[in-house]
């Protein structure tokens, strides 16, 4: 879970006028509760000047003040926090000059990493946390960071890839159309992720990739600069797709807060996939699909028990009532095993009839819809 500890009740504010730091007991309790439930925590090391919302990075004195606070936080939470992320969306530029050019952020990272390593050698250090990567200026900043000398020094790279992203045919996914951005963002997103990993690896990075803050807002959760025309059901379907896409690309998946009382279907999909996909790793195996459906997407996984998982869906605009379409799925090389279908939107699970053909399994008349159906192939 990704958290920001905020003892003053206002996001990202620290009172620099004091000569000591303290953690609010309520925040302490939240951290302890998460730890007791074996939840891995990422703590965002992000602070702003409360008067101007300006990031402290401009002078060496500013940086040293920040590092003093970082040292306190890491020392205080040593053994309880698994990841530390250096700032959130550091490239943001408010009315005051708070945005950080890449060289300034790189300089801050180079000085912050040794402090974290000294205080907690087991902790992982994450950089990036760049905002919506559909926008050209965000990706330009991101490429600058990925091509910098800090990539071999850190353990994680993060970005905010999906704020209401949707297939091009779904107008609800449009965001700030006057801002230069990638065409057909949803369709091109997997290629973007692959390019992120390629560039990072080429620059010496050997760590973990993390997508954060994914969300599909409804009209009950509006935001003036983000898409919010989705329904609970259509949003749930996009949550399901996005989780599978990122897991299939070997990216750790992070979501914004989804409240169960407001978004019951979305919450159900997230909860269901968290259970079904626990321990799953991408592992390609042969799959054949015959259907009148267009744009069928699928990803393959294995779990520690040895079972294989196939996630399959149609990748058009998500609707509340998708009538489904039949498909014939072949699994060459899998000559035995029990197939179970798992519908995380409806919370249903049932055995799927299959037969043998040409040394593999074949499933006829499988109904696929616009959200992931999980087929689990158990060992014989």
Segments predicted by a language model, with ranges:
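Conserved hydrophobic residues forming the short capping helix/wall of the S-adenosyl-L-methionine
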Residues: 116, 197-200, 274
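Carbohydrate-binding surface patches
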Residues: 290-335, 373, 378
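Aromatic/acidic polysaccharide-binding cleft in carbohydrate-active enzymes
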Residues: 211-296, 304
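Substrate-binding cleft and catalytic face of glycoside hydrolase catalytic domains
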Residues: 1-174
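C-terminal beta-strand-rich structural cap/linker in extracellular carbohydrate-active enzymes
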Residues: 353-380
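Solvent-exposed beta-hairpin/edge-strand motifs
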Residues: 330-348
